[in-house]
Amino acid sequence: QRKLGIQRIVIDPLSIRDLDALLVTQVHHDHLDLNVAAAILQNVDKDIPFIGPKYVTDQWMAWGVPRERCVTVRPGDVIQVGDIEITVTDSFDRTALITDCPGEPPVSDTDVPDMADRSVSYVVKTSAGTIYHGGDSHFSTSFSEQGKAFDIDVALLAYAENPPSIQDKMTSSDILRAAEALDCRVVIPLHWDIWSN
């Protein structure tokens, strides 16, 4: 990736000192990190909320985050953090459906788990504009519902050119279709690749 001019940005969890809330979209550990949770508990003076779907908050509590600081969310929930309004929306991360979660039996071919327990997306309304964070959502025609429901300025979407026989993130074509469906002004690609690459 270096020869493509792509630079990975790594956040030092120990440098986090001032934060209003921690939002996590899903249970995968490239999103949900023990070191980040521990650093926030140790270094941030405020008792900020840890916000995420059920399996995310379950994991935080297993790591020692106090139950009263964990806010379990589902699509349709609206949370106010200071002057910022956060609306929880559906996730379209099919990979989250086949991920084993702590304390749960392995996923079977016959029982489809509840996506909302595993993965969500967020619409964050600020005084500067509205941000949509799709987590690791794959392309879905349902993006158009979210585009109609919210005036989205910036969309954060998971991007990767998938190798043959694997679809883990949105391709460049999917990102374009998602941006059109969300009717957003700017797209910022996240993830930028998949683990097999």
Predicted regions and their residues:
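Cap/insert and terminal regions of metallo-dependent hydrolase folds
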Residues: P49-I51, H138-N197
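Active-site environment of divalent metal-dependent phosphoester hydrolases
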Residues: H28-L32, T57-W60, D77-Q80, R94-A96, ...
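Metallo-beta-lactamase
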Residues: G52-A128
